[in-house]
């Protein structure tokens, strides 16, 4: 069976308007991250179908924070890394001393192959580390280009919205202090978090 492309042509559903006062937001599922401060910043936890962009300088701890989140959650998590091997991630995870039986690790950069694994695994949270390493076979340019970042982000956003699976994207910061890639990326996602700290 061919993989779902998670684009608008993949769904047959017709969108219908709902009067604002008839929309039930009490049913919007949120799940706690296992970190009180992160829950507070996210307004009470991760929202189903939300896309979060976590930006920060290289080496500041974005990957470590998200790996810790993946291991603390009592949910099935797929952690996709375009920067580290599965063995490197396992070594970092082992040092944390947290349960590893619900976290799956994939070293991959092509979105079509990632979506094939997502379809097979059906994770409850998808973490992409990082958006700048991804590429779509539908676009000619290389990973990290403006068109690749825009396209791969759009594919992941459509996936999140159509499945209600939250997606966290890691974004690297340039020397100027902005997230690398097109400025539109920050407008495409639901939440942008800037991770800062002392090294």
Q: Where are the model-predicted features located?
A:
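Conserved P-loop NTPase
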Residues: 3-6, 10-20, 119-121, 132, ...
């Amino acid at each position: 069976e061919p993989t779902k492309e998670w684009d608008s042509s993949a769904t047959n559903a017709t969108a219908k308007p709902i009067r604002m006062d008839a929309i039930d937001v009490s049913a919007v599922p949120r799940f706690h991250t296992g970190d009180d401060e992160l829950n507070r910043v996210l307004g009470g936890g991760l929202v189903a179908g939300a896309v979060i962009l976590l930006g920060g300088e290289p080496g500041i701890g974005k990957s470590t924070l998200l790996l810790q989140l993946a291991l603390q959650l009592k949910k099935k998590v797929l952690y996709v890394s375009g920067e580290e091997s599965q063995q490197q991630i396992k070594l970092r995870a082992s040092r944390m001393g947290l349960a590893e039986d619900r976290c799956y690790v994939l070293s991959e950069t092509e979105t079509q192959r990632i979506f094939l694994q997502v379809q097979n695994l059906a994770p409850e949270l998808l973490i992409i580390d990082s958006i700048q390493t991804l590429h779509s076979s539908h676009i000619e340019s290389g990973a990290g280009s403006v068109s690749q970042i825009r396209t791969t982000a759009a594919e992941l956003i459509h996936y999140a919205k159509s499945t209600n699976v939250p997606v966290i994207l890691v974004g690297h910061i340039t020397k100027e202090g902005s997230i690398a890639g097109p400025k539109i990326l920050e407008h495409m996602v639901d939440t942008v978090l800037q991770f800062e700290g002392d090294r």
